[in-house]
Amino acid sequence: MIVTDSWIFVHNPKAGGASVEKALGEPLKSGHLHSPLSAIQKGGRAAFGFVRNPWDRMLSLYAYQCQKPQPPKSPAYQQLIRDNGFKWWLMEDEYFIEGWTPGLEPIQRRSQMWWLEGCDFIGRFENLRLSFSWICGLYGIKERPLPHINASSHAHYSTYYDDESRAFVAEHFAPEIELIGYQFEEG
């Protein structure tokens, strides 16, 4: 998250946020990197962020965790998710156990709307450069090159899903699917 006197950028994980932050400047150092807009006082400032197709986003998150371990992820966890594969990670991992208290899901598995509720503009990762340029013009932000940071390497997301895992994502990420109109697209 970046907060200025006139605007707020809300960093939704795996939706181009690191690239946008690099282009805009440094994020807050006070623990707000992946905070929802509701965590701070908006105070009349414009707020914006980005969403990503949830089927693509979940695969990107999985691939990123397999390729680049993040603290506090241990090498054993990284090997476990590699060995068991994407579907296991998505559906059987401890993150989605039965009875998980709604609203307390692990931060990267929450609906993207949890971060972005109250934003004045929500751009699409799929049109990141165009949306970023538009935002810069709208809010008087000096436009800088938009780098591609934290990219993960994998085939088109559709090749990783079967009917069951596809429906699982549709159910868990219904808010952004309905709001933005995302669909599962074949590669």
Question: What residue ranges belong to the model's regions?
Answer:
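Membrane-interface amphipathic segments in extracytoplasmic regions
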Residues: 1-187
